[in-house]
């Protein structure tokens, strides 16, 4: 799904809509993608001369992608992401990188 279709699922807009495209892999797995352009608000000051996407923004990107997964399971309501376990950041995400979030529903909704 493209960003216009994602807007029908997520309430986020403008600079806080952090999923550019999403796709269902199967009934329990979805992928979301966002390419870091370099002009995003969260890179201003983090860090001058060496921009790195803050971990909290990476978590938000993953959360939004996971809400796209739930869209087909929960109709007529706004999905809210409430929990993450064992999050580890292995490499810095920088301008030009594309973050792909693979989300799996391990609990039945």
Where are these regions (language model features)?
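Short Pro/Gly-enriched beta-strand edge/turn motifs at strand-loop
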Residues: 1-6, 97-101
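An N-terminal domain-start capping segment
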Residues: 7-14
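Terminal leader/tail segments of proteins
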Residues: 13, 21-23, 35-37, 84, ...
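Catalytic strand-loop segment that frames the active site of acyl-thioester-processing enzymes
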Residues: 14-53
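Active-site helix/loop of acyl-thioester processing domains in fatty-acid/polyketide metabolism
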Residues: 22, 53-76
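Hydrophobic beta-strand-centered segment that forms part of the acyl-chain substrate-binding groove
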Residues: 65-105
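Conserved small/polar residues in nucleotide/adenosyl-binding loops
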Residues: 107-109
């Amino acid at each position: 799904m493209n960003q216009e279709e994602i807007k029908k699922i997520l309430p986020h807009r403008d600079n806080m809509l952090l999923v550019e495209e999403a796709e269902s892999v199967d009934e329990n797995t979805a992928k979301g993608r966002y390419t870091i352009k370099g002009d995003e608000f969260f890179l201003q000051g983090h860090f001058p001369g060496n921009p790195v996407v803050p971990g909290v923004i990476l978590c938000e990107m993953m959360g939004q992608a996971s809400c796209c997964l739930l869209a087909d399971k929960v109709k007529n309501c706004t999905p809210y992401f409430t929990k993450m376990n064992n999050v580890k950041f292995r490499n810095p995400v920088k301008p030009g990188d594309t973050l792909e979030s693979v989300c799996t529903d391990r609990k039945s909704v």
